[in-house]
Amino acid sequence: MPDFMTNLIEKTIVINALATDVWKALTQPFLMKQWMGEEEMNLHIQTSWTVNSPITISGFHHLPFVNKGTILEFDEEKVLSYSHNSSLSRLADESENYSVIKFNLSPAETQTAVTLTITNFPTEVIYKHLEFYWQSTIVLLKKFVENSKLI
């Protein structure tokens, strides 16, 4: 098994906001679109947030894409996780081709620590892409929650 498959991406950031507000930004599609990508990406997010139900995040970034997966955990204001496979990877729709994205929230008074953990990388390219994307996107989440008048 190549090394990248056993790699783990883990990032923790402290957001100056209540867990309630962070949770809204992570789970309300209208708010998710505000920090997950630029407006021209025209993101569309569909899910019921029920465990074992589908999630799709589609849009346009140089090419049309559809990221799909399944909700794995949904413990309100605590844990959210889902599987992830992008159409851009051109990998078969098989379980071994899905990464797992997980958010753990740890509230402390008026702040919330968010730990993002990503596991299971079917290819090195996917590992590098997710590392690159989430390096900046987790910071965008923080800025959005701390500065948004929408929450």
Model segments located where?
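Intrinsic-disorder/low-complexity, polar/charged segments enriched in Ser/Thr/Lys/Arg/Asp/Glu/Gln
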Residues: 6-12, 19, 54, 66, ...
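Hydrophobic pocket/interface hotspot
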Residues: 22-23, 32, 55, 71, ...
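Residues at helix-coil transition
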Residues: 27-28, 76, 146
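A conserved amphipathic terminal alpha-helix motif
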Residues: 119-151
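Hydrophobic-ligand binding "helix-grip"
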Residues: 46, 61-108, 119
